[in-house]
Amino acid sequence: MQLQDSIFIVTGGASGLGEATVRAFHGAGAKVVIADVGVAKGEALAAELGEGVAFCKTDITSEAEAQAAVDLAVSRFGGLHGLINCAGVGPAWKMIGKDGPHPLDAFARTVNINLVGAFNMIRLAAVAMARGEPNAEGERGVIINTASIAAFEGQIGQAAYAASKAGVAAMALPMARELARYGIRVNTIAPGLFLTPMMEALPQDVQDALGKATPFPPRLGRPAEFAAMARSIVENVMVNAELIRLDGAVRLAGK
């Protein structure tokens, strides 16, 4: 699938990996709906990029708001060819903290946003994609989810986050198998240590140390590199049901 004139929804598209993806895809000629809870940033980005970009306030755990994002893509741009799921949260809670056990509601919230929210967007977007006309390869759509290397090497305090991202990674294959009949691919990117807003909030010396933990290149990943990987997946029809670690060969040891 070529990006030119294709229509995408990017969740979490107002900042970080999502914003980089919106910018890259729009720059390549795609039409993009930014689906994000951050209204000010989302509207500002849509205004900056102009024609071919729309913002939709979207809590991905809400059936109504997720459907509204899909409906906006169809009504504003004429259909839907792709979904890039970047929205998520990354809290840290120890199993046994100074105030007691890991809060159950914190675990549930993390899984609800990162896993259930991603699933919610996929199930609704897939219906819209399946209604579209296939291209010459018989392809109607492509879905890319964002997992994390924490799904495989979760650190202390990441039980909820790791569980949610492992679920994201695990659902790609059964989804890809089921949606193959409609010409819809499903893939997953598992980023390593990237310079996202959450990372930028850390002191510079901490950022530098984390970057040096990556074998090569010995630095934090750039959001534009995530966007480039997403574009590569979109444009290569043979990439399906894959999980790609985008991590510079880092393997996090337990601490």
Q: Where are the language model's segments positioned?
A:
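Canonical Rossmann dinucleotide-binding motif of NAD(H)/NADP(H)-dependent dehydrogenases/reductases
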Residues: 3-33
